[in-house]
Amino acid sequence: RLPKGHRLRVAISTAYWPLLWPTPKAAPVVLTAGTLTLPKRPLTKHSDEWHFEPAETSTPLKATQIKPAHHIRRNEVDQRTGLVSLIIEDDFGTSHIDDHGLISGSTARERWDIHPDNPISAKGHAHWTQTNARDNGWAVRTEALCGMHADEQSFHLWAEMSAFETNPDGKEEQVFHEHQNWSVPRDFM
């Protein structure tokens, strides 16, 4: 409920970067006078608040934390060029799963760039690392990278996947690698 005397602010934008990819050209917006009609929530029997039953859940996974998670969200503006970047760095930590001994960890790095005056400058890049190991020396790691940019006609994407396994002698060896590129027509997007 909106308390008496409070106001709602309606924000209208032609961009929702980086959640939605921008159109190839800046889109104009023309607003004329209008109204906003919001539904009124009916009162319940005892109050004007909703109450829900507790959620059903399974037994939590029993794990021992080896390295805590750490997350960074950072915006950067290149003062020379005006390029705006969103940098996301997620270290999800490392845990030992007590029931079966798997040691698991992962990190994710993302970068989303755009120049505010040039929607076609948008580009994104992500790099995910997943590690799994056991106390007996067995270990595997995957590296997944992908990126995207666009021109006025097409979206251009690339992806790369690599997998590594640690040999019994302790040496890590690449056991898989693939790289692909695609171009997809924008079809007025």
Question: What annotation goes with each model-predicted range?
Answer:
Residues 1-189:
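Glycine/threonine-rich phosphate-binding loop and adjacent beta-strand/alpha-helix elements that clamp
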